[in-house]
Amino acid sequence: MEDFVRQCFNPMIVELAEKAMKEYGEDLKIETNKFAAICTHLEVCFMYSDFHFINEQGESIIVEPEDPNALLKHRFEIIEGRDRTMAWTVVNSICNTTGAEKPKFLPDLYDYKENRFIEIGVTRREVHIYYLEKANKIKSEKTHIHIFSFTGEEMATKADYTLDEESRARIKTRLFTIRQEMASRGLWDSFRQSERGEETIEERFEITGTMRRLADQSLPPNFSCIENFRAYVDGFEPNGYIEGKLSQMSKEVNARIEPFLKTTPRPIRLPDGPPCFQRSKFLLMDSLKLSIEDPNHEGEGIPLYDAIKCMRTFFGWKEPSVVKPHGKGINPNYLLSWKQVLEELQDIESEEKIPRTKNMKKTSQLKWALGENMAPEKVDFDDCKDISDLKQYDSDEPELRSFSSWIQNEFNKACELTDSIWIELDEIGEDVAPIEHIASMRRNYFTAEVSHCRATEYIMKGVYINTALLNASCAAMDDFQLIPMISKCRTKEGRRKTNLYGFIVKGRSHLRNDTDVVNFVSMEFSLTDPRLEPHKWEKYCVLEIGDMLIRSAIGQVSRPMFLYVRTNGTSKIKMKWGMEMRRCLLQSLQQIESMIEAESSVKEKDMTKEFFENRSETWPIGESPKGVEEGSIGKVCRTLLAKSVFNSLYASPQLEGFSAESRKLLLIVQALRDNLEPGTFDLGGLYEAIEECLINDPWVLLNASWFNSFLTHALR
């Protein structure tokens, strides 16, 4: 029986059971049936809790998460398996916060949905006999009792079974499997006859903190926590099992598990073709700002007023001309659109009172640039369903594009520091829970590291542009509204600053569905000459619009000022996510917190202060062809933030697919590095799944190139 228990239950449950028996002075070598009973009860308690969460609306939902969702709260608190002191602390805390009556005995779970403690029973006898024993022992109407048997029967207080049928079926199936496994080994009769009453356990070994989170995050789909996965793996006989299962599914399928060795993986194949192009909704490292310090003009804070004030700071305007035409567009129309913006801004300035918003005249150039009347006419399906050759028009396959170094330069630039402060200390927001000293200290340290970062500028720029565009799309659906691209920051000395990057003209925006597209023309200032990397600017028509005096080491030099113009589009759902780009700050802060937690658990004290203030220590940042790149903790913060920001700026189905599929290969490689002797089948299929996501997206191609660097160094 002891061997069976060690095979059948995951090691953590076995260890907890061993501790409990030791505490009660019982020898598991002799009391083997009791050992099995304790393990079974523990596992049922864990399964009862698995996958059940409470969402933000307070509703109970079932999620089988591939990634733990930070916004969801676990429906059940597990009390069973904790050490006695901790278990009573949890019970007292629950009673204090919910007003629940304190139970006389330690219960197994607490249900936050129904606000009640739950006692779980697992019996080899009749469920009603066992239920009565439990009820007599507890003598409390407030504690809910739920009994399961090995025959698939169950009984619960007032026939209220708490969980949905599927969740209960999972528990019953597991109990039935345990019974069958025991029977096949000739252990069941002895186990069935040995029951003397419910066994409970109040000692528990816990993996906590970062290691627990990393363990729970690194599971295959459909496993909610490491215990379930361990239980599955422990009871798993790989030899022939997978092959057998697959052959049941289809005669054509056969899977041989091949060992995964250092020589097995090959680099991911990046596509050939012309270099990839810039596809972000606004310019990043190439943008240029016209700025005013300490703004105090009339109407300060109204975008149009701010924009006109910023435009007045520049005196080098000249007759615009096209220096890099757009390959397919009517370039004179882009030129005329910019001239129209200048003229209409001029008209505003001559008015007595500047209006709060400006709707552009619907000229032929703007109609063309915004795709007015270009959409094919929609016809009701009923009117044309009888047409014999009715078909959806063919769409071309996207052209393959090769990796280009400009996207690495963009990323490097995003990690750099600027000379402005882009977020205030409270930008990340208060914690939902009462904030502890450590959490607020971490937040302040992190904010100090990233407040000057260019990626943070991109966040604030993205939030502003998306908010303004969504507002205009709803408030002025038929108008070609002029929207200045503005950001606010502070100088090192703390002076306020308003920046103008350029303008957007919005097209018609009757957005009924989340994915309905609004077209816009963006016109952005820059000092970057597009002729240096013409492939990057494939989608743009670039004008030369002025000369700017730049202070340099050798005095003032005149540089041509360019305007990058392109037609673009976005949707309600994309703008909604763009408005929430501040989440990137939170995501990268949580990643840094995981690192601090890991360090703290090793040193057995909070290491926040040392982590941020020990400037001599370096940390791994990422892989490059040269090897593992290292840098200061500030550099790590900024790199993680830049990654999160680029995931938002370059969000796409290609990125989703690449992230999900390459993660599988990453886990296999990590298992190899940890000497876990991983085996794989259909590795070629995994490579195919990864490589079909590498089409033309610059950010995905950069991630694939990083992944290849990682493979090279990980398998040395």
Curated annotation (Swiss-Prot):
Record's Gene Ontology CC terms? host cell cytoplasm; host cell nucleus
Q: How this protein is processed and modified after translation, per its record?
A: Phosphorylated on serines and threonines by host kinases, including human casein kinase II.
Record motif Nuclear localization signal 1 (NLS1), residues: 124-139
Describe how the cofactor binds.
Binds 2 manganese ions per subunit.
Residue positions annotated to bind Mn(2+) 2 are E80, D108
Which cofactors, if any, are listed as required? Mn(2+)
The domain of life is Viruses
Q: Which GO terms describe its molecular function?
A: endonuclease activity; metal ion binding; RNA binding
Q: Where is this motif: Nuclear localization signal 2 (NLS2)?
A: 184-247
Broad enzyme group = hydrolase
Give an example GO biological process: DNA-templated transcription
Record-listed E.C. numbers: 3.1.-.-
**Subcellular localization(s) per the UniProt record:** Host cytoplasm; Host nucleus
Where does this protein chiefly localize?
host cell
What does the UniProt keyword field contain?
Cap snatching, Endonuclease, Eukaryotic host gene expression shutoff by virus, Eukaryotic host transcription shutoff by virus, Host cytoplasm, Host gene expression shutoff by virus, Host nucleus, Host-virus interaction, Hydrolase, Inhibition of host RNA polymerase II by virus, Manganese, Metal-binding, Nuclease, Phosphoprotein
Instruction: Outline the subunit composition.
Output: Influenza RNA polymerase is composed of three subunits: PB1, PB2 and PA. Interacts (via C-terminus) with PB1 (via N-terminus).
Sequence similarity: Belongs to the influenza viruses PA family.
Physiological role:
Plays an essential role in viral RNA transcription and replication by forming the heterotrimeric polymerase complex together with PB1 and PB2 subunits. The complex transcribes viral mRNAs by using a unique mechanism called cap-snatching. It consists in the hijacking and cleavage of host capped pre-mRNAs. These short capped RNAs are then used as primers for viral mRNAs. The PB2 subunit is responsible for the binding of the 5' cap of cellular pre-mRNAs which are subsequently cleaved after 10-13 nucleotides by the PA subunit that carries the endonuclease activity.
> What is the protein's name according to its record?
Polymerase acidic protein
Report the gene name.
Answer: PA
